Structure formats: structure tokens, C-alpha cells
């Protein structure tokens, strides 16, 4: 897997593009005007592993709230702007580290220029965002429907507007809820510009469908070397977006750190509540700072062999289970002590 070499862009304290680590993003779902609630959510995201946060800025009050929010958080903040160019200007003046706009809905060129001039003054990058759902009518007609080619043309038109105003601190985001259309659009745009790409499958759905669509789409793009920041968009608790993004990156070898839990799918030999045990293990290890693989297996017959690729694991039996390291049985443990035995082993693990 070779990553595309894109332009380096500074977003607050973080650099993206140019081979820098792929950053995980999410978006608050609080009212940005509610500073306390928004800060609390951002801090929770930060703890979960979010590295860049985006906030909706639909009002002047929200734009002005960014100044206080910025004082209390530790990760770069992106202001999401639609329609009113004055909100973009106010967001920059109040400390936004990046703004997300679609120049096509901000107004005429003079208004776009006012935003670009303010971004230049504060050295704030602009994310140019285009979604398939808001594709211009003329492009839909030109390509006979919503297509990857139309999405890319729309995005490049918006990029060109800002470039002609003398600014190139840009990030490009092109999204669709159609996985393969989204993949094709990113393949096309990567050939036509070298700005960092923020990738994701928009409106991907609930926890189940959203994770599947995002994993497939992001997995294909990341494997091709596309993407400098990612978001897994889910209808649900945004913290789950961050967990999923981390695991997608880790699964592709693009990120290390954090315990990976593997478990068997259960069968007729399973003698314990493996589903409950695996969930407890996953919750237990979330805050343990190790970069290892932990196996949770359902029987003592095949468990040791199946867990040999894990660094450590447990396998359940009738009333007792096994502690396993690298496929070797270390000791037998009472069933009710399996979880605590594993926890102690992890807490005493040599880093």
C-alpha cells in the first residue's frame, strides 16, 4: 500500500497530507451555542481518539461561541458553514482552525473573496466540501444523473474559484452515500489535484449499516493510498464513529496502538456465555495502553490452537477455563475468575 503524496496543510497544531498520519475526525451533535455541552462532547471525543473536530455554525451566536470553546479543548476545530459568508468570517475571527464551505452556496464571487481574504489573513485552511446530494442541476443533466464524474467536476470548479482568488491552503471533501460512486470519485480526483482528501461515506446509516458501508468504502480507498483524514459517519453516538475509524486504520496497518480483541463466532461446543464475556473484555481493555492482540475463545478444545496468533487469550469451559499465551496453555482458571485473571495479566504486561 503506497499513499498518495498530497500537499501538506496545517490545521491548528496538526499537519495533514504529505505522508503525515491519517487523522480521525468526527462532528459534534450539540448546539454549538451551548458551550458547556459542546466542550464536554469534544473532550469525550478527544479521549476516544478523535484528532480533528467539526462543529456546525448555523448562527452568529454559534460562531462567537467558538472563541470560548477553543479555550477549553485540545484538538483542532473545524467550523462547518453553509450559505452565510458572514458566519465563515466570524468563525475564523473566533479561532476556527479550518472552515468547511461549499463556495457554490456562499453567494457571489465577492462573498467568496471576503471569506478567502479572511482565511489568508488568519492562515486558516479551507475545506471545500461537495456531496452527491447537492450536485448542481447542470452537472446532473450533463452526465445523465448523479455520477462520480459530476461530483469531481463540481469539486474542482469550487477549488478553482478559490485558487483564482490566490489561495491554496485547501482540503477537498467529496462524499456520496453510494459506496462505489464515492470510491470512483476519489480515484478520479486524486489524478487531478494534490490537495489532501478528507474521505468518508456520507449518510451511511445506523451503527450496523453505517459501519459496514464505511468499512468497505474507506477500506478500498485507504488501501489505494487515498485519504489524509477520515470520518465514519454513523446515526448514533459519535464516539462510536471514532472507535470504528481507529479499527479501520489499525486493520489496514495504518495505525498502531490499542488492544485488538478477537473472538470466535460460537458453535455447539461453546460452554460459556462467550458473547457476554467478549463484550466485557472489549470494554475492559479500552483504556489499557497496549498494542497487542487478545483472544476470547469459547471452548478449551480448539481455543488454544485458534488463539495462537494472539499475544494472550482466554478459553472457556464448563466451570473453568484456560489462560493462553501465544497458543500455549499457561494455567487453568475458575470460570468466574477468567476476566479478572486476564485483566491482571494485561495490567502487568511488559511494555
Pin down the residues of each PLM region.
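Catalytic alpha/beta core domains of metabolic enzymes, predominantly
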Residues: 131, 139-286
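N-terminal amphipathic alpha-helix/helix-capping segment at the start of soluble metabolic enzymes
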Residues: 1-27, 120, 283
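Alpha-helix-loop-beta-strand connector modules within alpha/beta enzyme cores
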Residues: 60-81, 114-126, 186-197, 281-283
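Hydrophobic faces of well-ordered beta-strands that scaffold small-molecule active sites
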Residues: 22-28, 53-55, 77-81, 99-101, ...
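Glycine-rich, proline-tolerant flexible connector loops at the mouths of alpha/beta enzymes
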Residues: 29, 46-69, 100-108, 170-179
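Hydrophobic or amphipathic alpha-helical targeting/insertion segments
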Residues: 86-127
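Active-site mouth loops of central-metabolism enzymes
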Residues: 19-37, 56, 75-83, 139-152, ...
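Glycine-rich phosphate-binding active-site loops on the catalytic face of alpha/beta enzymes
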Residues: 51, 95-109, 201, 224-238, ...
Amino acid at each position: 500500500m503506497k499513499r498518495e503524496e498530497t500537499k501538506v496543510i496545517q490545521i491548528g497544531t496538526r499537519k495533514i497530507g504529505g505522508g503525515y498520519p491519517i487523522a480521525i475526525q468526527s462532528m459534534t451533535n450539540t448546539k454549538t451555542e451551548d458551550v458547556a455541552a459542546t466542550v464536554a462532547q469534544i473532550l469525550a471525543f478527544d479521549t476516544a481518539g478523535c484528532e480533528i473536530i467539526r462543529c456546525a455554525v448555523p448562527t452568529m451566536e454559534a460562531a462567537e461561541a467558538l472563541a470560548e470553546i477553543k479555550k477549553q479543548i485540545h484538538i483542532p476545530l473545524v467550523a462547518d458553514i453553509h450559505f452565510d459568508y458572514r458566519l465563515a468570517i466570524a468563525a475564523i475571527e473566533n479561532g476556527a482552525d479550518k472552515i468547511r464551505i461549499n463556495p457554490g452556496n456562499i453567494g457571489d464571487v465577492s462573498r467568496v473573496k471576503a471569506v478567502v481574504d479572511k482565511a489568508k489573513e488568519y492562515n486558516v485552511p479551507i475545506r471545500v466540501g461537495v456531496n452527491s446530494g447537492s450536485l448542481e442541476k447542470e452537472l446532473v443533466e450533463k452526465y445523465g444523473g448523479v455520477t462520480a464524474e459530476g461530483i469531481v467536476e463540481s469539486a474542482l470548479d469550487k477549488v478553482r474559484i478559490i485558487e483564482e482568488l490566490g489561495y491554496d491552503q485547501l482540503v477537498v471533501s467529496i462524499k456520496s452515500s453510494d459506496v462505489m460512486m464515492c470510491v470512483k470519485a476519489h480515484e478520479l480526483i486524486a489524478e487531478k489535484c494534490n490537495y489532501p482528501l478528507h474521505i468518508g461515506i456520507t449518510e451511511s446509516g445506523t451503527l450496523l449499516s453505517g459501519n459496514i458501508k464505511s468499512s468497505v468504502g474507506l477500506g478500498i480507498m485507504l488501501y489505494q493510498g487515498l485519504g489524509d483524514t477520515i470520518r465514519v459517519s454513523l446515526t448514533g453516538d459519535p464516539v462510536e464513529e471514532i472507535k470504528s475509524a481507529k479499527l479501520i486504520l489499525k486493520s489496514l496497518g495504518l495505525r498502531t496502538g490499542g488492544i485488538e480483541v478477537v473472538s470466535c463466532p460460537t458453535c455447539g461446543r461453546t460452554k460459556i456465555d462467550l458473547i457476554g464475556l467478549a463484550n466485557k473484555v472489549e470494554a475492559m481493555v479500552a483504556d489499557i495502553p497496549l498494542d497487542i492482540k487478545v483472544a476470547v475463545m469459547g471452548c478449551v478444545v480448539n481455543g488454544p490452537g485458534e488463539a495462537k496468533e494472539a499475544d494472550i487469550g482466554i478459553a472457556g469451559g464448563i466451570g473453568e477455563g484456560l489462560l493462553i499465551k501465544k497458543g500455549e496453555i499457561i494455567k487453568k482458571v475458575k470460570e468466574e475468575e477468567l476476566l479478572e485473571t486476564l485483566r491482571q495479566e494485561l495490567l502487568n504486561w511488559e511494555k
